[in-house]
Amino acid sequence: MILSDLFHETYAALSANKVRSGLTILGIVIGIGSVVAMISIGQGAAGSIQASIQSIGSNLVMVQPGFQRGAGAGPVSAGRGSATTLKQEDADAIQKEITQALAVAPEISRRYQITAKGKNTNTQVIGTVASYSQVRNVQVDLGSFISEQNVRALSKVAVLGPTTRDDLFGEGTNPVGETIRVNRVDFKVIGLTQSKGGTGFTNQDDIIFVPISTAQRFLAGDAYVTTISVQAKDAGSLATIQQEITDLLLQRHNIADAQLADFQVLNQQDIVQTASAVTNTMTMLLASIAGISLIVGGIGIMNMMLTTVTERTREIGLRKAIGAKRKDISLQFLAEAVTLTFIGGLIGIILGWASSLAVTAFTGIATKVSLPAIALAFGVSAAIGIVFGYYPARRAAALNPIEALRYE
Amino acid sequence: MIECKNIVKTYRSGEIDTQVLKNISFKINDNEFVAIMGPSGSGKSTLMHIIGCLDTPTSGEYLLDGQDASKLSADELADVRRQKIGFVFQAFNLLPRATVLRNVSLPLVYAAVAKEEREERAKETLRASAFPEGFWHHYSNQLSGGMMQRVAIARALVNNPALILADEPTGNLDTKTGAVVLATFQLLHQEQGRTIVLITHEPYVAEHAERIIHIRDGEIVSDGVNRNRRLINNDH
Ligand SMILES: Nc1ncnc2c1ncn2[C@@H]1O[C@H](COP(=O)(O)OP(=O)(O)OP(=O)(O)O)[C@@H](O)[C@H]1O
Ligand SMILES: [Mg+2]
């Protein structure tokens, strides 16, 4: 049997019962479509989480206070990051000792009620140093960022995030030169940062930066820091720097057992890896739920093919009588099943693509239709056709020609 | 050449074995026109299935051109059928959603003949059987019974088989169209020298053959030359 005949027979058979073929295809369309849509939503989420991790800077090692486990600590923990175990001196020591570090930016962050011109908002105030803008990839839109001079002089100056600006002064206004009041202390606005896009868990645009010295003196009243961001030269030195900082701080805090450290040193690569592990799991979960509908679609194919084989028993008998071999018959039915899934897969991919675009358009959730996902969907749909078409095709091929001919 | 040696065919349904063919032996030489005649249920179709390599006997030997069919696999039997045998069934068994041309060329599809040659041969065969050209592209389920049977005959001939097996080819036709079909067989036999085995329960139909094998209850009751042969005037 020649390939073109196989196409001819397949077309003739499928078009003979258009409604049934259409409904069976629909099952596959829904299955493949939802798999494609779910994978694209999962990958979109992965992409935006990666982007937001990258947006906090590149090649970062972050030191945060931890809670001390062990003797006397008790079972209740105040939660990671809330402890006050990192001091300004730790930051200074890192700056001095870790020579591989490109820049070190300690910060103290807390939420305060802010008032300006009778409006008020509650937002994150970060006391930090000049290098923060480089380390954490903060771009200034108007005015300037905190300078080293500001830090030395304990200047009462502030740099606003765009969302905070919108809340306090209205959208699109220039806040430079205005005064804001934080915790009964007046700060002069000297700059406005560029928007980072408010994705992720915290809105990086709803924020106020002040000099770290000012924050420690006038707002917090102590010399603790909440995070020390260290930028490495390149991704390759991240692990070394992470180790060096750990060793340094253990020594400074007089802790012998690294298990009992009262701080934690996070490496941005680890964060990225953890996040991608999470998003991959999520994508897998979404795809497997969608995969169930694909299996249901496959069962639909099998159901239709079994019905077709029964209906066409006489025809199969005749074909065998005039010389068709088992292979010819099974190939014919397999081709029908694969064609159904192939068409369904094609429409499903288009539909899945369209619906993920629609999701982005209407909900703003990032989606990403990737070529491998499409290739996978295509492969899966063809495989579904083969798997679920195999049994009916074999059944057709195994029919005894005489039994098939006398079948009423 | 066909040779049946002590052929027995037993069907088993549940616990009961029914012997449909009991010790059938005969020979049919090339270029013979033989009718196998017997009442309904006597085992004619069963015998034809064995002759046509659609089935194998329970015991005994069936030789087609000296080859023992019972030793062949299902696919090898398919090859034999495709190369040597043309079938005409009582119920026509055409593909309903296919054109006349497609139906006639179907055996060539399985012989992997290219499309152009296939169509050419199908047209030739249809022309030779004087099948009106206006109907070549009709779907087979739009034809009359007589026309369907002529399509079925053309399909049986398109492979140019040496042996033509016809099971009640006139059973669904009126006398007149039946006569046309019988005339076609006589012509194929006389002018093209094909071996024809015609299965029927009607003595009138059997009398168109040269030789009549009479079976009853799975046994041959008589086998001999047809002395009052009906010849249809074949000068159309
Ligand atoms: N697959 C089968 N299983 C069981 N019995 C069968 C089978 N095929 C045929 N038979 C039996 O074998 C007997 C002969 O059947 P067969 O079809 O050969 O008769 P026939 O001579 O062709 O009859 P008719 O003229 O009615 O076509 C019948 O009694 C039938 O019931
Ligand atoms: Mg019969």
Model-inferred region functions:
Chain B
Residues 138-143, 147:
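Conserved ABC ATPase signature
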Residues 164-167:
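Catalytic Walker B motif of ABC-type/P-loop ATPase nucleotide-binding domains
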Residues 153:
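Hydrophobic anchor residue at the start of the ABC signature
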Residues 98-107:
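Short coil-to-helix segment of the ABC ATPase nucleotide-binding domain corresponding to the Q-loop/switch region
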Residues 160:
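Conserved catalytic motifs of ABC-family nucleotide-binding domains
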Residues 60-68:
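Conserved ABC transporter NBD signature motif
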Residues 67-68, 116-134:
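Conserved ABC ATPase "signature" region
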